[in-house]
């Protein structure tokens, strides 16, 4: 069963699956929908039920050559989305032939933010949903449903975490980093290792750099580029086993590694998920360094 079909099936049936390890739920482990805590609460747009909700596009702008930042309005200015960290929403549109196209997207806006919800979305060649969203104009609507909880973050769950991402995989990792650093009581150390093809492909770099600058004693961000310019002051090439070995404390109950990115990144560093509900064993560089599925979570 495909990723989005599995998500839709679980939302439709209201099933709450058991957590794996410390997680309350996840796209890669188990889809737990926080219906009990948010159902019927006023001011929350998404409550985990089977209702598709149309949101109006307020504005959008280009952030890279193939990526846009989108702001969708909630029904009321005092409403919040109802999402938690880290969670995503399903999106849907109907083709001229009557076929449903459904895809998940992770917001980058603060879950406590009022009145709107924001996404950074890359347009892929042949991507039906990403192309549709990129074609939206202000006041056009898009159908959303959720939330789909991927990992429920609790402050100080770990002494340190590593966020390893590539391309658009940055969005759930940014969610976690933002959630941790906005809470002065959360002392979790954060290492973000983020790979892209070129400098212009780096998503939400301004936001990442702002957090890193503001929280120098807590957050470390390292960028990797396959094709780096001459004046590049980050890393060049792929995120390697040797690099991870030099930067990570090693597997243990006090730290966790979160991975999100394209198939090649999973293959090289953590191994792929077996299915949307099965994380599978850890493979690749992290396995070589002694990490197991208790130490690694794959978005």
UniProtKB/Swiss-Prot annotation:
Organism listed in the record: Debaryomyces hansenii (strain ATCC 36239 / CBS 767 / BCRC 21394 / JCM 1990 / NBRC 0083 / IGC 2968) (Yeast)
Enzyme Commission identifier(s): 1.6.2.2
Protein family membership: Belongs to the flavoprotein pyridine nucleotide cytochrome reductase family.
Cofactor: FAD
The protein's enzyme class: oxidoreductase
GO cellular component, one term: mitochondrial outer membrane
Subcellular location, principal: mitochondrion
GO molecular function: cytochrome-b5 reductase activity, acting on NAD(P)H
Classification via InterPro entries: CBR-like, Cbr1-like_FAD-bd_dom, FAD-bd_FR_type, Flavoprot_Pyr_Nucl_cyt_Rdtase, FNR_nucleotide-bd, OxRdtase_FAD/NAD-bd, Riboflavin_synthase-like_b-brl
Catalytic activity of the protein: 2 Fe(III)-[cytochrome b5] + NADH = 2 Fe(II)-[cytochrome b5] + NAD(+) + H(+)
Gene that this sequence comes from: MCR1
Every FAD-binding FR-type domain range: 50-154
Transmembrane feature ranges: 13-35
GO biological process, one term: ergosterol biosynthetic process
Highest taxon of source: Eukaryota
UniProt cross-references to Gene3D superfamilies, sorted A to Z: Nucleotide-binding domain of ferredoxin-NADP reductase (FNR) module, Translation factors
Task of the protein: May mediate the reduction of outer membrane cytochrome b5.
Subcellular location: Mitochondrion outer membrane
Membrane topology: Single-pass membrane protein
Protein's name according to its UniProt entry: NADH-cytochrome b5 reductase 2
